[in-house]
Amino acid sequence: MKDFKKLFKLQWKKNAIWLILLIIGSLLINTLTFKSYTNDIYRGLTNSVESFEESLDIKKDKRIKKPKEIDKSYIEYGDKLRDKLVEKYGIIPNEELMSMETDEIDKYYAKDRSMEFNTIDSKVANYDVRRDQLLNSNSENNLFSQYTNFFIFPFLFILAMLLTSIEQMTNYFDFTRMYPWSKTKDFAMKLVFGLLLTLVVYLLHIGIEQVMMKTSGLAKLYTSSGLARFFVKELILYWIFFVIFISTGAMSGNVFGHFGLNIIAFGLFELSVFDISTIQTVLNGLDYGPTIMTGFNEFLAKQEGVLLYFLSPLRDFNLSNEMLIAHGIIAALVFILAYFIVKHMKTENSGYMVINRPLKIISQTLASLTLTALIFNIVTSTFVDYNVYIGIVLYLFLLFVSYKLFKALFNIKIKV
């Protein structure tokens, strides 16, 4: 505990200005974004109701004025107008379409529709979306869960960089080797420090969002019931991402390596499949048929559980238990790898993109193959006719250039 207090003081003295700016920046951006989010729902509902009144030719003296705060009676009024339009134009609402068979949906959309019908259909759909955002009582899909605070992810990544990759780029890192605790303990304490700071910042975000909600035009219909579970799951997600960010940072000697290892951590399987698929294309031609990429995508399309999010972590991003478990497994694997690399790291490797030689070889190889595959696919997309021999020569040339490029980058030591 004493060592943790010492590390906390050292990190705060070293990064206080950056941490304060980072926290204020994340709070400010999230505040503005959340305000825009609530205003969008308010305007969407009130504008939809006004458009319903116009479409039904309701006299102005019988229309309801736009309220400062939307209440239950206003929603009931909007529902009544919406139902009249649905009946008048024979519109099938989205929630009913979702339960229909594909053939029935195709028949519905195959009918000739007037411009007026399409306009009303769009108005009804917009109203339903906003109404659902405000009134859906499902704890997994309520007002707050419709809003994901993506701006906390840059905060987590920059915080991880300050504690790891940026520190390794400075001469201060050499001084840290004189700390009266081991390298692995230093890594573990930084992880705890970051998790606690993430908790504090997240609670500040929630507090500000709650105050803004209570003072918005949605206050009368807003309920906080069922939000505790959502907030806990969201916090777990942020903690998982921070573990990944700080673990990749601990294995990186500079910020460029930090970015690269995160790309590998989240895209290892997809990048590998892409590279192998490109090699298949090089050898067999552009029109050869299904590649390993095709098979991989078809396999993922059939998956719904943990395996889907493990193989493709950022696909269909949500807060499902399956996604949290998959990301948790990735975080645990990356953390274990980082722990052993930190345990055996040499101070003189700080400043390089990757501080461990075996990991450096793997990363450099994957980076070279991926860049080659990317450029090859871009270039060959302009070809009218593809010749296998020309394709092989082009691929080998691009691979040679990519290898030389990344070999140079991985051997550059950055110290400030």
Name the predicted role of every residue range:
Residues 34-55, 64-65, 268-358, 370-415:
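Terminal transmembrane helical anchor/hairpin motif
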Residues 163-197:
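Helix-loop-helix units of permease transmembrane domains in multi-pass membrane transporters
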Residues 142-172:
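Long, hydrophobic alpha-helical segments
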Residues 1-23:
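Aromatic- and glycine-rich beta-strand/loop motifs that create alpha-glucan
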Residues 135-142, 193-257, 270:
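Secretory targeting signals
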Residues 36-127:
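Membrane-proximal extracellular/periplasmic loop immediately following the first transmembrane helix
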